[in-house]
Amino acid sequence: FCLSRGLGDVYKRQTLTFAEDGRTLFGTNPETAALVMTAMGVDAIGVNCSTGPDKMVSVIEKMCRYTALPIVAKPNAGLPQLVDGETVYDMGPETFAQEMCVLAEAGADILGGCCGTTPEHIKKLVEECKDLPLREIEKKHDTIVSSYGQAVILDDMPRIIGERINPTGKKKFKEALKNEDMDYILKEAITQQDK
């Protein structure tokens, strides 16, 4: 199932599926996913299913920049194709193992396979990747705020925070909040953003 490279027992793993555009189905980018999953208190985070290993490299690299947790990579054996009514995956064990070494070099610490992988894929993966050095994990000390889909790093640059959607002293805005008038609230937020 997977090769945990020198990490001992890792229990709580959280992985997400990313499309070829590098985002989840909800539009979350890898950086934000890494931040949110890290904050959840899991032991390892990463990417599963989705695509073949060749399409996961940039996602793994981006996640590594925003977490000190081990990174999981469990791709498919290529992209699924329908052949004679059957789902098949076109990446053989040799190619899969070579591509997984690239993922390990990109920062993945726990390597495995998802759809289309076989015991032979995992055997080749272990043979090819077992002696690769682990990445040096650095503790992160950034201050970051995040929604489900986007993160903002609060660095030394000044941040302008608008008052347009602060309800203090704004009767019309308070009423909009009370009445759940999202059209008005959104219009005010967009007006603030445009200034």
What are the roles of these predicted feature ranges?
Residues 16-29, 81-95, 155-187:
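Active-site mouth loops of central-metabolism enzymes
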Residues 19-21, 38-109, 128, 132-134:
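Catalytic-face loop-and-helix region of soluble metabolic enzyme cores
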Residues 13-17, 48, 72-76, 114, ...:
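A cross-family glycoside hydrolase active-site/sugar-binding cleft signature
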Residues 187-195:
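Catalytic domains of carbohydrate-active enzymes, especially glycoside hydrolases
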Residues 117-151:
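Terminal amphipathic helices with adjacent charged low-complexity linkers/tails
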Residues 30-34, 60, 100, 189:
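Generic hydrophobic/aromatic pocket-lining and core-packing "Φ" positions
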Residues 1-11:
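Single conserved hydrophobic/aromatic residue that forms the stacking wall/gate
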Residues 9-40, 44, 73, 80-83, ...:
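Conserved anion-binding
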